[in-house]
């Protein structure tokens, strides 16, 4: 029986505990999860694509069923190319749903071979976003409960040299 793979795409700028929650829950459903760092979301990025890949790879090193890759272009093309059939998307609030629903419908319009699975974030992460993390860290606020220690160190290096 072939492995059932899913793709969890995002900018991950930076990766948060909310992202890791979705990855871990995805790994309970699928044989493997490809964490796909989007190359075409560079505008206003704090971390380069390479830095994000390195952070994610180190953080996920104890999760062999998760692998980190990068992609550009249409997500559904990438998903088909890597042999996956499901896109995982995390939803924090109802406000996320409308945009994500539109993307899922467009992807479905492009191909019927790829499904989108929406996962509600766990309650502790329902407000969490990479943008909030960057804002709080930039202002020297505490982000210890929002991101792994490696990411906190990387944020400190960016904002405080």
Swiss-Prot record:
Single biological process term from Gene Ontology: coenzyme A biosynthetic process
Residue(s) at site: Transition state stabilizer: 19
Pathway: Cofactor biosynthesis; coenzyme A biosynthesis; CoA from (R)-pantothenate: step 4/5
Catalytic activity: (R)-4'-phosphopantetheine + ATP + H(+) = 3'-dephospho-CoA + diphosphate
GO cellular component: cytoplasm
Domain of life: Bacteria
Subcellular location: Cytoplasm
Keywords: ATP-binding, Coenzyme A biosynthesis, Cytoplasm, Magnesium, Nucleotide-binding, Nucleotidyltransferase, Transferase
Cofactors required: Mg(2+)
GO MF term (any one): ATP binding
Gene3D superfamilies reported for this sequence: HUPs
Transmembrane segments annotated in the record for this chain: none
E.C. number(s) listed in UniProt: 2.7.7.3
Residues reported to bind ATP: 11-12, 19, 90-92, 100, 125-131
Family matches, as Pfam families: CTP_transf_like
Binding site for substrate: 11, 43, 75, 89
Disulfide bonds: none
Its biological purpose: Reversibly transfers an adenylyl group from ATP to 4'-phosphopantetheine, yielding dephospho-CoA (dPCoA) and pyrophosphate.
HAMAP family registered for this protein in UniProt: PPAT_bact
Entry's family note: Belongs to the bacterial CoaD family.
Oligomeric form and interacting partners: Homohexamer.
NCBIfam families given in the database record: coaD_prev_kdtB (TIGR01510), cyt_tran_rel (TIGR00125)
Protein name per Swiss-Prot or TrEMBL: Phosphopantetheine adenylyltransferase
Organism classification: Bacteria, Pseudomonadati, Thermodesulfobacteriota, Desulfuromonadia, Geobacterales
Gene symbol of the encoding locus: coaD
């Amino acid at each position: 029986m072939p492995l059932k793979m899913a793709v969890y795409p995002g900018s991950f700028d930076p990766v948060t505990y909310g992202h890791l929650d979705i990855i871990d829950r995805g790994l309970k459903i699928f044989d493997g999860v490809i964490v796909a760092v989007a190359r075409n979301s560079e505008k206003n990025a704090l971390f380069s694509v390479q830095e994000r890949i390195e952070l994610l790879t180190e953080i996920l090193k104890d999760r062999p069923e998760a692998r980190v890759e990068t992609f550009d272009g249409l997500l559904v093309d990438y998903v088909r190319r890597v042999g996956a059939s499901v896109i995982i998307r995390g939803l924090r609030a109802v406000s996320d749903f409308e945009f994500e629903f539109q993307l899922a419908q467009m992807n479905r319009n492009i191909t019927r071979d790829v499904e989108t699975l929406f996962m509600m974030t766990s309650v502790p992460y329902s407000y969490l976003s990479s943008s909030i993390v960057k804002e709080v860290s930039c202002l020297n606020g505490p982000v210890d409960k929002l991101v792994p220690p490696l990411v906190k160190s990387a944020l400190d290096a960016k904002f405080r040299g």
